[in-house]
Curated annotation (Swiss-Prot):
Protein name: Multifunctional tryptophan biosynthesis protein
One GO MF term: indole-3-glycerol-phosphate synthase activity
Pathway: Amino-acid biosynthesis; L-tryptophan biosynthesis; L-tryptophan from chorismate: step 1/5; Amino-acid biosynthesis; L-tryptophan biosynthesis; L-tryptophan from chorismate: step 3/5; Amino-acid biosynthesis; L-tryptophan biosynthesis; L-tryptophan from chorismate: step 4/5
Lineage: superkingdom: Eukaryota
Residues annotated as domain Glutamine amidotransferase type-1: 23-223
Signal peptide: none
Reactions catalysed, as given in the entry: N-(5-phospho-beta-D-ribosyl)anthranilate = 1-(2-carboxyphenylamino)-1-deoxy-D-ribulose 5-phosphate; 1-(2-carboxyphenylamino)-1-deoxy-D-ribulose 5-phosphate + H(+) = (1S,2R)-1-C-(indol-3-yl)glycerol 3-phosphate + CO2 + H2O; chorismate + L-glutamine = anthranilate + pyruvate + L-glutamate + H(+)
Region annotated N-(5'-phosphoribosyl)anthranilate isomerase, chain positions: 519-752
Active site residues of this protein: C102 (nucleophile), H197 (for gatase activity), E199 (for gatase activity)
GO cellular component: cytosol
UniProt-listed Enzyme Commission number(s): 4.1.3.27, 4.1.1.48, 5.3.1.24
Length: 752
């Protein structure tokens, strides 16, 4: 850093009175720098009146007819400590020019829907190098200059609303390449702010910045003032053009990162590590509703600004799947829609293990193969291709490349000419965007008008602008097969209820089908007689111990005899209403059904910290229907064992709710057979940690306490889908047949 230079106007020449700044009002947020701002404004010829933020009303200011407004710095947070500043910005935006300094800028960001947060450092008089866009208050200034900062808060990049643009930045200074927002400007209104202090003696060209502001006379930029010098070029570009140009630059930069080079992505794909995919058209044809739902995860949009900035994409995806969505659309454009490819990757992971998961669509402005390959590696089943932004040659190339990766694209059209292109291309799925991407106007009749151009075999999806059942009725009659809904779903307080209302049906179709009574597992079985008694009593699972050194270890010859009894003895079957094949049933609801054989009990072999090869060989030798891992075996073993796997967890263990590995988790206190009851609060905490979790409960259960133990868990007890007993049905170390019968009866009576 160079020596500090005093840029203050020690012997400043006062400018002549500015007729355009004859009634400037300065809102004082109780900050000492307000005097310095007043000084600079007056030196530039303004006539200024100062009001503290709690001593004047908006109505008072309206009556005073200000020519310009300035919002001063101040201590605290813009949401709680700025008095009427936010109300002033909201009322006068578009009417008169407004300039905000430090907290004044933060008020502008929050007033238009953004957020401010801590920057990670508290600055008091620090000088930094500023980079700016040479428009607005920066007109006529060098592109790099020294400014002074007094702040700990600043606007956050991810929440800057679409109506504002970032005009200046300083580097974070940690070699990360990240920067802190130092200036914002409204794209339409003459509203501009700076995070630094132009009135500080260490800021270069501070007076010039105030002069540039004072020369503004209108409330908008459309009269060729200030920032509008460069605005006409932007005005000629549609939002689609802007996004395309921005994404092109961003993707070009991304491909320079060594790990993200096209060659690196191709090498990863060649290793066959992309998540398994499904057929997008086939999944669209499966729905319990009259139309298939493409449910969109949408944090923001150019037309609506911030919709739900803090949404957890994978959690939202599970909600959509539970509500019956056939497709989940994930917006991965970061600037206007606030999404990333990481959202898609997390969404795909969250759907792992669903028996009939929704397809995953990458909703992005795709213009090269790199983006399609990136999508497939992240887990996409399909990508969006927008006819309006691609020439026919490029569209054709991208379409066939996507199909070469097993992904039938969603081809988006808006006009009859674009529909003809999509049909000639051979598109199996065509989306009609009811929103014109050049004007962003919505016309829900667009889809209907284009239907007569489409072959009967083509799936047509209506995109954009759908908010309620009234928007859907006509589509049902006209042959539309699917609708895409984003904003309305994101704002719905109850996703499943909204979907049922929107598409006409009952969200009860999508509730997990649960047995009327829990599974019962009689463990530690050592005789054919014990197995037979348990089965005849109605037990679902017969457990035999395969752990060397344990008192309940069953020799192979005895185990084979028990196996024959289990497989030849019928038992009364519970009736379970199977869900529709189109339903995305939760993993643990599905796997509970797997452990409920329609006509007999299942034989479970219990192992603990034994080699995988031994576990597999014993499973094959003894004909085990299920394997139980009761030690610290890797989670991945569940996918390497050729039968369903029950895995033991203690409260607090990591991985209990991981889908697509263990069939069900068994919640137990120790090594098994200890007779120790689990602490009620610990069990509740585990069960309440994940809405979709289901468990087999073990540890200290017996015929007398099993019903009460589950009842004490309250509503959480509904997630207990199985009960495991060993020592609780023994007398003097041997299985007691009467206790077995009593336990099964008591356990089965819990939910009838």
């Amino acid at each position: 850093m160079a020596d500090l230079v005093d840029h203050s106007p020690h012997h400043a020449t006062k400018a002549a009175k500015l007729a355009s700044a004859s009634n400037v009002i300065l809102i004082d947020n109780y900050d000492s720098f307000t005097w310095n701002i007043y000084q600079y404004l007056v030196l530039e010829g303004a006539t200024v009146t100062v009001y503290r933020n709690d001593e004047v009303t908006v109505e008072d200011l309206v009556a005073k007819k200000p020519t310009q407004l300035v919002i001063s710095p101040g201590p605290g947070h813009p949401d709680t400590d700025a008095g009427i500043s936010n109300a002033v910005i909201k009322h006068f935006s578009g009417k008169v020019p407004i300039f905000g300094v430090c907290m004044g800028q933060q008020c502008m960001i929050t007033s238009f829907g953004g957020k401010v947060d801590v920057t990670g450092e508290i600055l008091h008089g620090k000088t930094s190098e500023l980079k700016h866009d040479s428009k607005g208050v920066y007109q006529g200034l060098p592109t790099s200059l020294e400014v002074t900062r007094y702040h700990s808060l600043a606007g956050t990049h991810s929440t800057i609303p679409d109506c504002l643009e970032v005009t200046s930045r300083v580097e974070l200074g940690d070699a990360s390449g990240k920067n802190i927002i130092m200036g914002v400007r409204h794209k339409e209104f003459a509203v501009e702010g700076v995070q630094f202090h132009p009135e500080s003696i260490l800021t270069q060209y501070g007076r010039k910045m105030f002069r540039n502001f004072l020369e503004l006379t209108a409330g908008t930029w459309d009269n060729k003032q200030g920032a509008a010098v460069a605005a006409p070029a932007d005005k000629k570009l549609s939002i689609l053009d802007k996004i395309y140009a921005h994404r092109k630059n961003a993707v070009d930069e991304q491909k320079k990162i060594p790990a993200l080079r096209p060659e690196a992505l191709q090498a990863a794909y060649d290793l066959n590590i992309a998540p398994p995919q499904l057929s997008f058209p086939d999944r669209l044809r499966q729905s319990d509703y009259p139309l298939s739902l493409m449910a969109e995860i949408k944090r923001a949009s150019p037309s609506k600004g911030i919709i739900s900035a803090n949404v957890c994409a994978p959690a939202q995806a599970r909600e959509y799947a539970k509500a019956g969505a056939s497709v989940i659309s994930v917006l991965t454009e970061p600037e206007w829609f606030k999404g990333t490819i990481d959202d898609l990757r997390a969404v795909r992971q969250s759907l792992e293990g669903l028996p009939n998961r929704p397809a995953v669509l990458r909703k992005e402005f795709v213009f090269e193969e790199y983006q399609i390959l990136e999508a497939r590696l992240a887990g996409a089943d399909t990508v969006l291709l927008i006819v309006k932004m691609l020439d026919i040659e490029l569209l054709t190339r991208l379409y066939h490349y996507s199909r070469s990766l097993g992904m039938e694209p969603l081809v988006e059209v808006n006009t009859p000419e674009e529909m003809k292109i999509a049909v000639d291309l051979g598109s199996e799925v065509i989306g009609v965007n009811n929103r014109d991407l050049t004007s962003f106007e919505v016309d829900l009749g667009t889809t209907s008008r284009l239907m007569d151009q489409v072959p009967e075999s083509t799936i047509v999806c209506a995109l954009s602008g759908i908010s309620g059942p009234q928007d859907v009725e006509a589509y049902k009659k006209e042959g539309v097969k699917a609708i895409l809904v984003g904003e309305a779903l994101m704002r719905a307080p109850d996703t499943s209820a909204f979907v049922a209302q929107l598409l006409g049906g009952s969200n009860q179709n999508f509730a997990g089908a649960s047995p009327s009574s829990p599974l019962v597992k009689i463990c530690g079985t050592r005789t054919e007689e014990g197995a037979l008694a348990a089965i005849q009593a109605g037990a679902d699972l017969i457990g035999i111990i395969m752990v060397q050194g344990r008192s309940r270890l069953v020799p192979d010859d005895v185990a084979l005899g028990i196996s024959r009894v289990v497989k030849s003895t019928p038992r009364p079957a519970d009736t379970l209403q199977q869900p529709s094949s189109a339903t995305s049933l939760e993993w643990f609801d599905h796997s509970t059904n797997i452990l409920r054989h329609p006509s007999r009990a299942l034989l479970v072999g219990v192992f603990m910290n034994q080699p995988l090869s031994y576990v597999v060989s014993q499973q094959q030798k003894l004909g085990l229907d299920v394997v139980q891992l009761h030690g610290s075996e890797p989670l991945e073993w569940s996918s390497l064992i050729p039968v369903p796997v029950i895995r033991k967890f203690a409260p607090g263990d990591i991985g209990i709710a991981r889908r697509a590995y263990h069939t069900l988790p068994l919640l137990d206190s120790g090594a098994g057979g200890s007779g120790e009851l689990l602490e009620e609060s610990g069990v509740k905490k585990v069960l309440d940690s994940d809405e979709g979790l289901r468990v087999i409960l073990a540890g200290g259960l017996n015929p007398d306490n099993v019903a009460g133990t589950v009842k004490k868990l309250g509503q959480s007890g509904q997630k207990v889908v199985g009960l495991d007993v060993s020592s609780g049905v023994e007398t003097n170390g041997a299985q007691d047949l009467e206790k077995i019968r009593a336990f099964v009866k008591s356990a089965k009576s819990i939910r009838q």
